[in-house]
UniProtKB/Swiss-Prot annotation:
Keywords: Immunoglobulin domain, Membrane, Signal, Transmembrane, Transmembrane helix
Similarity comment: family membership: Belongs to the immunoglobulin superfamily. BTN/MOG family.
Membrane-related topology note: Single-pass type I membrane protein
One GO cellular component, as annotated: external side of plasma membrane
Extracellular side: 18-237
SMART domains xrefs: IG, IGv, PRY, SPRY
GO molecular-function terms, A-Z: signaling receptor binding
Protein name, as recorded: Butyrophilin-like protein 3
Length: 466
């Protein structure tokens, strides 16, 4: 019976030349920063080696990837997909192919399809790509006393699409609260939710729920009876009594502690300074020459003497180049795929800058992309609020400190680390560990903020040994 069925199908194929295209299903689910795989096949099995195979988005002419005449036609792709697709054709003789779409972002959401065309017949299948991002664990903080109660604030970042945030009481009941969600420049949502509770409220939960992934994360805080609500009169009387009784003891204690701890604290500071200096001295042994590539610079960035980048108010007229960034970025002419390398960048009093390395094959035509290791970036940023942050691979906020005017960057390719130094006080800002470097890496600078009054050039500077 099976043999007869095979003969019938073979005869049908030879006579009609028709077949059906089967896609990956009604929808494909993918997480931001990861890859999505679209698998398509022909039924009955038919070789697609001599066919045109087109993956498209929303409409037929919006090409995600094109296979024709036995070759991949990258020139036909939409710019946002160049360098991000991998056409897998190991089983194309049996009519089975796959397309891997790399580094998924929220902007990739939409309707996709695969289309097979022979000389006498064509057919397609479509599906929906759904994208999600799982954000950080909720962070609960106690703001203080408000309107006779205790105000709690819960924060979580990096979600897509917008999640549901709510407070829950000790029995799991939903509590009335105020919430806000704001999308950042990468379409990821930051959630903020607040509530006012009474003393002895017990266990209070902050819950963030993403329905699309059936994913929920919670954090808990226990509100007991020990919270002390300050009354001005009661607080004043208590402070007066304590002040009179303890003033002498405090003064004497401070004197004793001062002399005991002065030497210890100074010794610890000296050790930290020497330790940081030792790391920096070792890094500077691997100093390399770095020059900027003008062909990669955004039109608003002017590169001079191959070392200096200045943010202009108006874009320059520059020749078209596939190497040029659509973000206000520039990379070096030099690239590294082995060894240890150190260079220094003078950022002056600027804010909103990024300094670090990126893979040579990152999508330079895409503006809204998270500069994280998942997307081929290992960078440090200083925001307008003088707050450092980086990704490894998720968002890391670093403790505020005096912003440097010069940043040292130390790349250890085989060691899988990149360190950032404040060369002003010779301290280590942060080290990204367990980095999985692949391919060629280039020194990277993003000069994101334009300030006509305070803005100054950013430049690669000679390594200082002081």
């Amino acid at each position: 019976m099976a043999f007869v069925l095979i003969l019938v199908l073979s005869f049908y194929e030879l006579v009609s030349g028709q077949w059906q295209v089967t896609g990956p299903g009604k929808f494909v689910q993918a997480l931001v920063g990861e890859d999505a795989v679209f698998s398509c096949s022909l039924f009955p099995e038919t070789s697609a080696e001599a066919m045109e195979v087109r993956f498209f988005r929303n409409q037929f002419h919006a090409v995600v990837h094109l296979y024709r005449d036995g070759e991949d036609w990258e020139s036909k792709q939409m710019p946002q997909y160049r360098g991000r697709t991998e056409f897998v054709k190991d089983s194309i003789a049996g009519g089975r192919v796959s397309l891997r779409l790399k580094n998924i972002t929220p902007s990739d959401i939409g309707l996709y399809g695969c289309w097979f065309s022979s000389q006498i017949y064509d057919e397609e299948a479509t599906w929906e790509l759904r994208v999600a991002a799982l954000g950080s664990l909720p962070l609960i903080s106690i703001v203080g006393y408000v309107d006779g109660g205790i105000q709690l604030l819960c924060l979580s970042s990096g979600w897509f699409p917008q999640p549901t945030a709510k407070w829950k009481g000790p029995q799991g009941q939903d509590l009335s609260s105020d919430s806000r969600a704001n999308a950042d420049g990468y379409s990821l949502y930051d959630v903020e939710i607040s509530i006012i509770v009474q003393e002895n409220a017990g266990s209070i939960l902050c819950s963030i729920h993403l329905a699309e992934q059936s994913h929920e994360v919670e954090s808990k805080v226990l509100i007991g009876e020990t919270f002390f609500q300050p009354s001005p009169w009661r607080l004043a009387s208590i402070l007066l009594g304590l002040l009179c009784g303890a003033l002498c003891g405090v003064v004497m204690g401070m004197i004793i502690v001062f002399f005991k701890s002065k030497g210890k604290i100074q010794a610890e500071l000296d050790w930290r300074r020497k330790h940081g200096q030792a790391e920096l001295r070792d890094a500077r042994k691997h100093a390399v020459e770095v020059t900027l590539d003008p062909e990669t610079a955004h039109p608003k960035l002017c590169v001079s003497d191959l070392k200096t980048v200045t943010h202009r108010k108006a874009p320059q007229e520059v020749p078209h180049s596939e190497k040029r960034f659509t973000r206000k970025s520039v990379v070096a002419s030099q690239g590294f795929q082995a060894g240890k390398h150190y260079w220094e960048v003078d950022v002056g009093q600027n804010v909103g800058w990024y300094v670090g390395v990126c893979r040579d094959d990152v999508d330079r035509g895409k503006n809204n992309v998270t500069l994280s290791p998942n997307n081929g970036y290992w960078v440090l940023r200083l925001t307008t609020e003088h707050l450092y942050f980086t990704f490894n691979p998720h968002f890391i906020s670093l403790p505020p400190s005096t912003p440097p005017t010069r940043v040292g960057v130390f790349l250890d390719y085989e060691g899988g680390t990149i360190s950032f130094f404040n060369t002003n006080d010779q301290s280590l800002i942060y080290t990204l560990l367990t980095c999985q470097f692949e391919g060629l890496l280039r020194p990277y600078i993003q000069h994101a903020m334009y300030d006509e009054e305070k803005g100054t050039p950013i430049f690669i500077c000679p390594v200082s040994w002081g």
